[in-house]
Amino acid sequence: MDPRKQYEGHLKDYPLTNYPDYEPGHPPRSERLEKIGFLDEVEKIWGSRWGGSGGIGRLREVALIKPTEHEVDPLWEKDRNFFLLRRVRVDIDRLKQAFEDYAQVLESLGVRVRWMEAPQSWGAYGPMRKLFMGAFPLVIKGGAIVSRQGQASFMRGVEVNFTKFFASINCPILHTIHGHGICEVGVFVPIAEDVIMGFKSCASNDDGLEQVLSVFKRSEVKEMPVAHSTTIIDDFEAGGEFHVDMVLGVVDIRKVVVYPGYLDYNIYRWFKDREFQIIEVPKDEHHKFYPANLVLIEPGKVIMAKGATETIRRVRAAGVEVIELDTTGLMAGTNGIRCVTLPLVRDPGPGLD
């Protein structure tokens, strides 16, 4: 019973028997409270069960962040390599329109879109870039894990905006990565109910993974395989991808899209040992469209980059419905669909058992 939603009487008439530690005429029987878990109470206290990335069930709610003129400040052009501007100069009008188009697609599919503000644009070392990126924190069963960035110093500080946002929507923060931990946990990939793929790279170290795993255990995550991602040193063309969601996407239960050029062998074996169908992304489509960076609406239904025609053909041949989205505007901001998306609520979905 949720008393806030179901009780309609006067306060003075509220039945004391609704308190689980109540015994007439005695102090609270506190030992009874030890049997009640956080997840048993989260919706009653916070108003929602939360959990956008704990599994692959039907997506119900996301947050997006509208890009602003801040993203085209001349400062970023002083050194494009340092500011990770791999492609053409950011076109703010195309980027804004891409967000509007994406939001319309989500809403047409029954997904609620919350628009998040990013008022803090200065971080630990100066102005921050990529403030419209939603996939830094992770929302699992019960609440959010707030990330600590490792890809670049100009991202150190975005967690303030996310912390304020979670407070504004009554989403509890379960943990903030701290100490010497680094973990851009929002790009972890849910594989099935209570199975989430982590990764190690410049964007996720051992300390960060250890912190995340301790939270996962209390939020009913049963397994966290860890991919070893590639890196960038001097040249974007020679480098790889430091986020696992750039090379791996789930399209259905036991069906994944991967770019094998940046997928480590242990993860390949992990999928094969569990009888996953692996759909390969062609090299040219990976570098042009990042088709593995997709958004799962529900098992067997995904949003993918429109230009990746061969990957889409292969995904459809595997029995998956694909909604195509023109991502050229997003790509002008050097990002894929999933990079800008913060899933907040999903239905329970299928597991691997």
Over which residues does each language-model region extend?
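The feature marks the mature, well-folded catalytic cores of soluble enzymes
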Residues: M1-D353
